[in-house]
Amino acid sequence: MIKTTGLTLHYGSSQILHGIDFEAKVGQITCIMGTNGTGKTSLLKALAGTHPRSGGSVELAGEPIEVLRPQQMAQRGLAVVPQGRMIFPLLTVRENLETAFALLPKSEHRIPTDIYDLFPVLKDMTHRRGGDLSGGQQQQLAIARAMIMQPKLLLLDEPTEGIQPNIIQQIGHVLAYLKAKGGMAIVLVEQFFEFAYALADYFYVLRRGAVSVFGPANNFEKAALRAEVSV
């Protein structure tokens, strides 16, 4: 679904990513892990087309991509749940969900029934302002908003950060549901090891802006992978 070859990325004169070869396939959850400052979020931005790469190539469904505007991202079937959630605090839950309509044809301006099935708290709080929700509820709202776009590629940046355990478990169930539903590639940047290990089909571990190890989840002993991630 999405593939990079020799990807490099700079912020000013500082090189952040060094020759990244990466691939995420439909029907799989591909997890990017590593300690703080290893380039995980920068790689996600390069995949999303929201930050220009310095070198190498990125292909989405076999077609090269450059820096993309939100409308172009949606047209390519790409949705992002960024770190920090980025919901609109003064809009209601329903209005936040409806902001996804701006990136869809008018015929698709509806909230799918499975959104409220997967996130019942959003149905209960449909008229409450986004800023009044807890951090976990805001994260559910951000994921639901991305799902309304019916993406073929879903990118999530540390969705468990600062979230209470019961909502982390629910988010895990949602990602497992989306994977089983098919037709979507999921890329997950995550630092919560147990959450990632339970869900991911494929791992990339970054160290100092480069891939240190990668491979299918069943290739790794749990303790060995944990040790790689913590270096």
Regions found by a protein language model. Name each.
Residues M33-T35:
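The feature captures the beta-strand-to-loop junction immediately N-terminal to the Walker
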Residues A48:
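Helix-to-loop junction immediately C-terminal to a conserved catalytic motif
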Residues G56-P64, R76, E108-D117, V213-G215:
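Conserved ABC transporter NBD signature motif
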Residues R129-L133:
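Conserved ABC ATPase signature
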Residues A146-M147:
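ABC ATPase C-loop
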Residues L154-E158:
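Catalytic Walker B motif of ABC-type/P-loop ATPase nucleotide-binding domains
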Residues Q169-G182:
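Helical segment within the ABC ATPase nucleotide-binding domain
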